[in-house]
Regions:
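Short beta-strand/loop motif that positions the catalytic acidic residue
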Residues: 350-352
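Catalytic active-site module of serine/aspartate enzymes centered on a nucleophile-bearing elbow/loop
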Residues: 377-422
Length: 422
């Protein structure tokens, strides 16, 4: 096989795939049998944990965090060999709450459909770790935390971050948990970037990387969307040069607008047409005296923006979108992704979605091409979906089969079941 020149079909391509599923001879429309599980299966009530790390963390920008906190959740049990750990890496606005429910909150985690007993990321087989990364705003050290040098919130003074900073912080949590090697590092979007970075920074610390709806670097269009969102935030009078917490303010309108911009890019035109079309919420296009005329899609975006601005921090949004812009997996390898992936030792599963235009399937095929050229074991599946970039978070039978089948084989290779000898 000439890996340099092989073209990847638009629907599915698998190279050196683990032998559980012979997808080279199987269409994703064909049945692939996995254990049945009811749609309402859940790990149940979960409790977040917090780790205070005393070990200094030197960031890529040169700044040293003498200490930092990480909030995380775990699901399932670690086996006696401590070999069944899976790290979940969240995307831009994600957090540690990937699955289950809180005692006082009935809303499930952001990946509830995929994490739990009998689900694709099976907590009967794996010990799953989901962490809120530094720079975010859900309890881990970030812009809303107190700067020990000033006694005030970090705000816009929080140091710039790179994906490798998240990886190094996650590694400290890994050591705290007594895990020497992840069975898999799994993530979508920015989470997939972290999985790839893990494979280069610590190639002996993971057996598999699952990269979903991601890219080796952002396109100019993606960077442009991020800059427009940041400008929306900074244009809010309540932004106060990023020191809004000191003034007991928050740029809610700017952050809501930023989220509205982002949300449009996460959906496909087809889905928006199906969901909203040109339906009106209030007003009448015929009656010119009716003001304002409001389309359903306007109402939806306004709701999403307002909800997001009430729960996320503007400085965190700016910080993490800049981290996305800066991400370039092969930059220190003379911009040669094949040379970059030559350092990886793990197996890869790369997944993309047909209607995703924010992280288009072409980006995933570029990852797969580079991995094949580097001689790595890689499986690639493009999932048919009309859900756009958000498809990686939403139910999809073929997606479940591809992800669940791959991880089922990973579990079989581990041998020792979860909870043995514990």
């Amino acid at each position: 096989m000439n890996r340099q020149s092989e073209k990847i079909p638009a629907s599915i391509c698998c190279v050196n795939f683990l032998p559980l599923l012979d997808l080279m001879h199987t269409s994703l429309s064909d049945p692939i049998m996995l254990p049945d599980h009811p749609s309402d299966t859940s790990i149940g009530i979960v409790t977040p944990q917090s780790l205070h790390i005393e070990q200094p963390l030197k960031l890529a920008c040169g700044v040293v965090l003498e200490t930092h906190d990480l909030v995380y959740e775990t699901y399932g049990e670690l086996n006696s060999a401590k070999s069944n750990g899976i790290l979940l890496c969240h995307a831009l606005s994600g957090d540690h709450h990937a699955a289950g429910f809180y005692q006082d909150d009935s809303r499930p985690g952001w990946w509830e459909h995929y994490v739990g007993p009998g689900k694709p990321i099976d907590t009967d087989k794996f010990f799953v770790v989901s962490v809120n990364n530094i720079g975010s705003c859900f309890g881990s050290t970030g812009p809303t935390s107190i700067n020990p040098d000033t006694g005030k919130p970090w705000g816009s003074d929080f140091p710039s971050l790179r994906a490798r900073d998240w990886v190094e912080s996650q590694k400290l949590l890994m050591e705290h948990l007594g895990i020497e090697c992840w069975a898999a590092v799994v993530g979508g979007s920015l989470g997939g970037m972290q999985a790839m970075r893990w494979s280069l920074e610590h190639p002996d610390k993971l057996l598999n990387a699952v990269v979903i709806a991601s890219s080796m670097k952002l396109t100019a269009q993606n960077i442009a969307f991020n800059e427009i969102a940041r400008r929306a935030i900074k244009s809010d009078p309540d932004f106060c040069d990023g020191r809004y917490l000191e003034h007991n303010k928050a740029p809610l309108k700017g952050l809501a607008l930023a989220r509205m911009i982002g949300h449009v890019t996460y959906l496909s035109d087809e889905l928006m047409g199906q969901k909203f079309g040109r339906q009106l919420r209030i007003g009448d296009l015929i009656d010119r005296n009716t003001d304002p005329i409001e389309f359903q899609v306007e109402s939806y975006l306004n709701y999403q923006g307002d909800k997001f601005s009430d729960s996320f921090d503007a400085n965190s949004y700016i910080l993490i979108t800049k981290m996305l812009d800066y991400f370039d997996l092969s930059r220190e390898y003379n911009s040669d992704p094949v040379a970059a992936f030559a350092h990886a030792k793990c197996n890869f599963l790369v997944l993309s979605f047909s209607s995703d235009w924010r992280f288009a399937p072409e980006r995933s095929r570029e990852i797969t091409d580079a991995l094949m050229s580097a001689g790595k074991s890689v499986s690639y599946v493009e999932i048919e979906s009309d859900k756009g970039h958000d498809a990686f978070l939403l139910p999809n039978e073929r997606y479940e089969k591809a992800l669940g089948g791959y991880l089922s084989r990973v579990a079989n290779r581990l041998g020792a079941p979860a909870g043995d000898g514990q």
